[in-house]
Amino acid sequence: MCSSDLGLWLDAQKGGNAWLNPYSAAAVEYVGDLVAEVQGMGFEQVVLTNVQFPKLSRKQDYGETSGVSRADQLKADIAALQSRFAGSMTLWFSYTLDQCNTNSVSLDVPAVTLGMDNLLVTADKAMDADSRTALEQSAAGQGVQHLVLHSADIFQ
């Protein structure tokens, strides 16, 4: 268990890497500082993956949450990062197709509802036209401005 302000628990399945606590302003600032560092290297776009909570366990302790739900905290973190880099860097948030369509345990809501401007969706296989249209409409209805679909056999 990590006890710093940034990470509160370790992910045994990922070699003991610490998770950053989405409720920690310092953790969100740290991610933003990493994006700023990449921007300073000349990159104009960055893809952020795993902006989520770990799978639930009894050992998790997020510290003070002020009653803010996990989904609302992720929305606030995404909004803070987008605001910080508005007009200077394009941020993409990457989620699986399943996370976009269902309430996953790591998000509590479908990813399309988290308020990102740019969404990269990864699918295990190509989507049929109806499924793609449904995803596009769902994302647009939630304010997603740009949607990119990456599947095993196509990148659109």
Name the predicted role of every residue range.
Residues V35-A36, L74-Q82, R132-Q137:
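Generic structural signal for well-ordered alpha-helices
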Residues G15-E29, T65-S69:
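The substrate-binding groove and active-site-proximal loops of carbohydrate-active enzymes
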Residues F93-K125:
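Substrate-binding cleft/loops of secretory-pathway carbohydrate-active enzymes
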Residues M1-S3:
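Short, small-residue-biased leader/transition segments that mark boundaries at the very start
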Residues V47-T49, R70-S106, G143-D153:
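Aromatic-lined carbohydrate-recognition surfaces of secreted/lumenal glycan-active proteins
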Residues D124-Q156:
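Conserved alpha/beta catalytic core and glycan-binding cleft of carbohydrate-active enzymes
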Residues E44-D72:
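Active-site-proximal loop/short-helix segments
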